Amino acid sequence: MQARGTVKVQGDANVDGKMSTGQHPHHQHLNSTQANATTTALEYRAMNRPLYRGPISHNIISEMAEGFYVLSGGYKKLFIPSKDVYALMQNVGMHLTEEEFHDALRVIGQSEPQNADELSFSDFLLLMTREVDDTMADELRSAFFHYDKHKTGYVTRKQFTELFATLAERSTPEELEELLAVAEVDETDDKIDYNRFVNELTSRVNCM
């Protein structure tokens, strides 16, 4: 499983999802300026992420900054239309209804009607990485399917430990114990309800 699940939006593009590779002359300036402005928020989010994930990396910030630049029409704008962000999310596989999209805007603090039409880079970053968390949940659940051949909804403690020990970012023994605690498993349990585990992780992330 590729833990990041990030959406790469590169080069010249319109909002129909057709992207071409390439760098922009203002890209580097945009990255550094916006990254500095969101450092504190990112550090806070990193502390609250599930143990199998690392903090948001510079690469993720760079990719999101490039996407923001593309949606701004190639100009260094402070805000972009939220409707363009919604269209982009639809075209890169983040299938939300309009109601779900507006719910997500409320979660990131865009609850006021006068603010809902435009997003700053910080809002864009929070929104896109939040949706990545949902993609992560699907990827993690799919990883459990590898062990649950008969789709019972359960894996053994050994299989659970093996899964997290073989991920790209291997969990330490201490982290595995914490993950087992999230799964509400004690030493006498051998079966783990992985759907409940994934849902609990998702719930914790969404409460950030």
Swiss-Prot record:
Residues the entry annotates as binding Ca(2+) 1: 118, 123
UniProt key word Metal-binding: yes
GO molecular function, a single term: calcium ion binding
Keyword Calcium: yes
Domain EF-hand residue range list: 64-98, 99-134, 135-170, 171-206
GO cellular component, one term: myosin II complex
Region ranges (Disordered): 1-35
InterPro entries with a match to the protein in the record: CALM/Myosin/TropC-like (IPR050230), EF-hand-dom_pair (IPR011992), EF_hand_dom (IPR002048)
Binding site residues for Ca(2+) 2: 148, 152, 154
Stored SUPFAM superfamilies: EF-hand (SSF47473)
Entry remark concerning the domains of this protein: This protein has four EF-hand domains, two of which may be functional calcium-binding sites.
Name under which the protein is recorded: EF-hand protein 5 variant 2
